[in-house]
Amino acid sequence: TYNDNAMINVMNQLRLIYEQKVPFTFIPEEYQTKTRAAFDKGVECILKTQVKQNGELTVWCAQHDHITLQPTKARAYELPSLSGQESDEIDILLMSLPNPSQEIINSIEGAVKWFEKVKVEGLKKEFFTNEEGERDYKMVACTDCKPLWARFYDLETNRPFFSDRDGVKVYSIAEIGHERRNGY
């Protein structure tokens, strides 16, 4: 799972260990070697799970099936999708690797190209207090705002979508409840 950056957080810890970074300077060399091997297997998994659309590398799903490596559902509101959230941390990790292979370079470039293609422009979050006195937000048009990326994109169309605890895919964040809307 890449969900909530779980795997990337672990890989960053593994890297600190095999590079003997503080606070892991005391780890014996035999464990550093094992840790490096585990990290390298993680990179292999990242490369194998990168989703292709029409033969082009894109990004990753938050959750992949452990056998088929295909995008799969996690929690009820986390449908199979391309992830605009977890994928950025995956790509940043790959970008940080010294002397990357051509396969890693292609992976990075595919993800960057996808992020450029699907960025959402002309919208920003506007916060307000709702009728129950809770902090909430809505999306409003703007002309000079920075681009945004959705957390979930349709696997085939790249259209941003949202889902509530009922697992129903909708295309406006206003269509989901306060709890999930403010949990994205």
Positions of predicted regions on the chain:
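Solvent-exposed loop and edge beta-strand segments that line ligand/cofactor-binding
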Residues: 1-7, 73-86, 97-100
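Beta-propeller domains
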Residues: 3, 7, 26-27, 31-57, ...
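Short, structured motif recognition centered on aromatic/hydrophobic residues
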Residues: 14, 43-46, 87-94, 112-115
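Intrinsic disorder/low-complexity detector
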Residues: 15-24, 37, 41-44, 116, ...
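Structural helix-adjacent loops and short alpha-helical linkers that scaffold large soluble proteins
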Residues: 18-40, 97-109
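CBM-like carbohydrate-recognition segments
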Residues: 52, 56, 113-184
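Flexible internal linker/loop segments at domain or repeat junctions
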Residues: 54-79
